[in-house]
């Protein structure tokens, strides 16, 4: 049986970490692409040499030509400029939109049957643009953000309650930004919804509100600490979870930036919602029941995403 071919577009901190995890998990043959000559080749060789230590037979190759990703089953896109202190994700839009155009054209020409996961920020606008530039079916192009945001939410809950992260199920909706919506009523610790934890005294409402606020600013917290870049370990793990569900047809329900066609009362845009990921790509959107407060927060987040889409259209008239 032929092994899957995984193309990692961008050999920066996330790209290199993706290659390392994919190799350890033996997800398939790995192509690490970057326009910077030597960078993908060096990282691929380093990880390949490490495989002799962690005992996995893997194929890794660093490349600088999109032709080398021909026939890729999965493409994970991290290419672009990362955030630095004082920058919002939205500040990256103009630069990274041009990158998405080049990447989309490369995928369209050489890997038109791939399942594409976009990580580049501002995420919701970039995955929308990438789908248009690539021309791939909308269910085969999704964005990684919700898995990461929900993981941060879960970790902060675990840290505060002292409960294993394995027994915490946390969810976020909306765009990947400060207006994201941590779904307090639908998130659980040991099966108990978070409002019930407050009633039982595990958490105070003030503590829960603090966790929600920290979740929304989770990426910025790391940017401020690193000073020279943004998060890469957790984003890479999140994308690998999505790719694994696709390659192994696991049908996992994961929050991702997905193209909506009427779900949540929205149509024609990408935004973070829970979705079943299987061999068909984004196979089914899961719709949470939302109250008036949640609807209002979600609507605010969606408006932020729409604003970024309009900004993209103003830069590139090919986007519709």
UniProtKB/Swiss-Prot annotation:
NAD(+) binds at residues 10-15, 34, 96, 119-121. The active site is at residue 176. SUPFAM superfamilies: LDH C-terminal domain-like (SSF56327), NAD(P)-binding Rossmann-fold domains (SSF51735). Substrate binds at residues 83, 89, 121, 152. Its EC number is 1.1.1.37. GO terms for molecular function: L-lactate dehydrogenase activity; L-malate dehydrogenase (NAD+) activity. GO terms for biological process: lactate metabolic process; tricarboxylic acid cycle. Keywords: NAD, Oxidoreductase, Tricarboxylic acid cycle. Pfam families: Ldh_1_C, Ldh_1_N. InterPro entries: L-lactate/malate_DH (IPR001557), Lactate/malate_DH_C (IPR022383), Lactate/malate_DH_N (IPR001236), Lactate_DH/Glyco_Ohase_4_C (IPR015955), Malate_DH_type3 (IPR011275), NAD(P)-bd_dom_sf (IPR036291). It is an enzyme of class 1 (oxidoreductase). It catalyses: (S)-malate + NAD(+) = oxaloacetate + NADH + H(+). Belongs to the LDH/MDH superfamily. MDH type 3 family. Catalyzes the reversible oxidation of malate to oxaloacetate. PANTHER family: L-2-HYDROXYCARBOXYLATE DEHYDROGENASE (NAD(P)(+)), L-LACTATE DEHYDROGENASE. This is Malate dehydrogenase. It comes from Caulobacter sp. (strain K31). The gene is mdh.
